[in-house]
Design a protein with these regions (language model features):
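Interhelical loop/hinge segments that connect adjacent transmembrane helices in multipass membrane
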Residues: 1-6, 215-264
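Membrane-water interface segments that mark the loop-to-transmembrane alpha-helix transition
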Residues: 8-12, 17, 58, 62-127
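Residue-level recognition of pore/gate-forming positions within transmembrane alpha-helices
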Residues: 17, 21, 48-51, 150, ...
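Membrane-embedded alpha-helical segments of multi-pass transporters/permeases
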Residues: 25, 29, 55-59, 115-123, ...
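Alpha-helical transmembrane segments of multi-pass membrane proteins
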Residues: 116-128, 132-156, 173
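Hydrophobic alpha-helical transmembrane segments
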Residues: 144, 174-230
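Membrane-interface junctions at transmembrane-helix termini in multi-pass inner-membrane proteins
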Residues: 150-176, 198
């Protein structure tokens, strides 16, 4: 299977990047005009925390995307080190099914870990900076909704890697674009309904499901489902494959998280100091 990037893929990529960046800018005037200063501050505090949560996925998406590309290009065996040679025109669907099992396992654990941290350490931090959840109405409930939205955003993230790795660049960008447009429409509509900051939190919670649905429909074609339907994957195969992938991913993961913490730790200290 040959993977080609066309001009349409590039154009859709630009559209996707624009809306990923512009979605916050488009919603911002409505947030500033319809929310109190305390709610605006709380919203940006959650966004700051959300940037750290996104680091949980910073190394895994490229890793899964790269290895999915190997598999759909005909690679029959994955290696920890060395050059992987493509010695076949046939896709090893058993290994593809194993990779899907690894992706689900990894992202399930990452998202659950992030949710636990948000509901424990994150809740303590928010309690401190909101003066015991009193500065903003329903602050605790808003934080729980935000934590759940972060959970689903991380859990569904591997679909982007699957589409990219299988050469469906345009389709991946369409899914991302649809999700961001849904976020914009939901945020503005719910703000006009008078839900306040809950509007943004609910939009963040609901919009990823649209992206996930579209991504699923694009990646899991009937042909792919027919090929992997009868594959029996053992837990040992999933663990062994993960060890191969983790060998190089851990280095990038530690480096990225360390760099981010060094550059942005001051924001969290400022939040505690100014609370």
């Amino acid at each position: 299977m040959k993977i080609r990037v066309t001009k349409r893929d590039v154009i859709w990529g630009y559209f996707s990047i624009f809306f990923q960046t512009a979605s916050g800018v488009i919603v911002l005037p409505f947030i500033l005009s319809m929310l109190s200063s305390e709610e605006v501050g709380f919203n940006y505090l959650m966004l700051t925390v959300g940037t750290i949560v996104s680091l949980f996925d910073v190394s895994f998406s490229p890793m899964f995307g790269r290895n999915i590309s190997y598999l759909f290009s005909g690679v029959q065996v994955l290696k920890k080190e060395g050059v992987i040679e493509c010695d076949s025109d046939t896709v090893n669907y058993h290994l593809v099914a194993t990779m899907l099992g690894v992706a689900k396992l990894v992202y399930r654990r990452i998202s659950v870990t992030a949710l636990i941290l948000l509901l424990t350490v994150g809740t303590v931090y928010i309690y401190k900076v909101t003066d015991g959840f009193t500065n903003v109405d329903n602050a605790l409930f808003l934080w729980i909704i935000f934590s759940l939205s972060s959970f689903f955003n991380i859990y569904f993230a591997y679909f982007n890697a699957l589409l990219t790795g299988s050469g469906q660049i345009k389709e991946e960008k369409k899914a991302i674009l649809s999700s961001r447009i849904a976020y914009i429409i939901l945020s503005i509509s719910l703000l006009y309904c008078g839900l306040g900051l809950m509007s943004v939190c609910l939009a963040n919670l609901i919009s990823p499901f649209l992206g996930r649905y579209i991504s699923y429909r694009y990646f899991f074609t009937q042909d792919l489902l027919d090929h992997i339907k009868g594959e029996q994957i053992t837990k040992a195969e999933i663990i062994d494959t993960f060890k191969i992938l983790w060998f190089n991913t851990r280095k990038l993961c530690i480096s990225t998280i360390g760099s981010y913490c060094i550059n942005n730790f001051g924001m969290f200290l400022a939040g505690l100091f100014l609370s």
